[in-house]
């Protein structure tokens, strides 16, 4: 049975996506692109992977202070994420690409996003150098909001107390936000990944404040789907590791419209695929999506990806998946293969 989305969203920050927001958020790519006009801001720092409800709490505090001080609200994040530099392919799967972080943040009344290149040289600078050269000299930070677990500088030696001391010396205020909790659990990117892996999509949606979304440009595939009555839009997953896999009931956002469908996220082992991709079939849709930018919202997990003994067996399972997804959305059983409807009638 389909869950009630209204029951999931128990936290509604004042900077929600539905709120009126600034038309444009400035993207500053690299420390070398910080200009004198960028001095003077309220700032928060982090990975913002997934831009989840815990991040929302930090951003709400940031925006509140930006209004009070009449200063720009700025988010500093890192590319690659620090663990991707230190751990390589062993780093946790990303929830969001940089573009997806930008899209999420620009709807939250943030004025600037500073993307810092995280390389070995940057990682080895001392905490004091980070504070004095970047926060004070270049950004002129007046107010800093960080999570209660924030660490920085070589060996992660910098912490909230060091920032507080620096604030007293250089004249900026530092606030530590307490971790946002749902059902007594600290909301974190790690917790979101665990729920995604387990297929608990309602829980994921509750922690993110929205459905988990994969975005990208529709590319040409091998067109196997159309040979069995299920043409698909294909998105290459340009990530070292993907955080989610399997078959899902989805909604696809394209050109201001929303279409329900069914999608597979994975390597397609039955047809000897090797690279992860997202293949989505839109219900009752006719049109050409090639080259278009789309967002795929993963609403409900149907099953894990699996390898079938034959292409015929795969086709039959795809038919069952489509039937299950339509049922989850409460859609009529139209435009399904007659053989599948006959099987359903027999089973009933």
Language model features by range: what are they?
Residues 35-97:
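N-terminal catalytic cores of NTP/NDP-binding nucleotidyl/phosphoryl-transfer enzymes
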Residues 15, 221-348:
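Phosphate/ribose-recognition catalytic cores of enzymes acting on nucleotide-derived substrates
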Residues 11-12, 17-44:
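Positively charged, low-complexity intrinsically disordered leader regions
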Residues 121-231, 253, 309-315:
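Classical nucleotidyltransferase
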Residues 67, 87, 91-92, 99-108, ...:
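Active-site-adjacent structural elements in enzyme catalytic cores
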């Amino acid at each position: 049975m389909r869950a009630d989305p209204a029951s999931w969203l128990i936290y509604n920050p004042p900077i929600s996506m539905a709120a009126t927001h600034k038309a444009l958020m400035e993207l500053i790519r690299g420390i070398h692109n910080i200009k004198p006009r960028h001095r003077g801001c309220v700032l928060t720092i982090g990975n913002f992977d997934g831009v989840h409800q815990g991040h929302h709490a930090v951003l709400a505090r940031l925006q509140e202070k930006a209004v009070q001080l009449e200063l720009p609200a700025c988010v500093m994040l890192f590319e690659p994420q620090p663990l991707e530099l230190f751990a390589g392919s062993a780093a946790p799967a990303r929830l969001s690409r940089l573009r997806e972080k930008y899209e999420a943040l620009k709807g939250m009344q943030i004025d600037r996003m500073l993307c810092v290149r995280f390389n070995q040289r940057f990682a080895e600078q001392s905490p004091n150098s980070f504070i004095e050269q970047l926060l004070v000299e270049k950004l002129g930070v007046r107010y800093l909001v960080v999570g209660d677990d924030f660490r920085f500088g070589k060996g992660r030696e910098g912490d909230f107390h060091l920032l507080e001391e620096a604030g007293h010396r250089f004249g900026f205020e530092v606030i530590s936000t307490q971790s946002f909790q749902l059902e007594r659990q600290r909301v974190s990117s790690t917790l979101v990944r665990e729920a995604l892996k387990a297929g608990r999509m309602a829980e994921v949606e509750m922690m993110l404040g929205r459905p988990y979304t994969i975005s990208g440009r529709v590319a040409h595939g091998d067109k196997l789907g159309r040979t069995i009555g299920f043409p698909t839009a294909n998105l290459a997953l340009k990530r070292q590791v993907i955080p989610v896999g399997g078959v899902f009931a989805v909604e696809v956002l394209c050109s201001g419209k929303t279409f329900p469908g069914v999608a597979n996220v994975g390597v397609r082992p039955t047809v000897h695929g090797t690279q992860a991709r997202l293949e989505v079939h839109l219900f009752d849709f006719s049109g050409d999506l090639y080259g278009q930018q789309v967002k795929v919202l993963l609403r409900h997990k149907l099953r894990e990806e699996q390898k079938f003994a034959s292409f015929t067996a795969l086709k039959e399972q795809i038919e069952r998946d489509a039937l299950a997804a339509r049922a989850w959305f409460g859609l009529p059983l139209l435009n399904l293969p007659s053989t599948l409807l006959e099987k359903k009638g027999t089973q009933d």
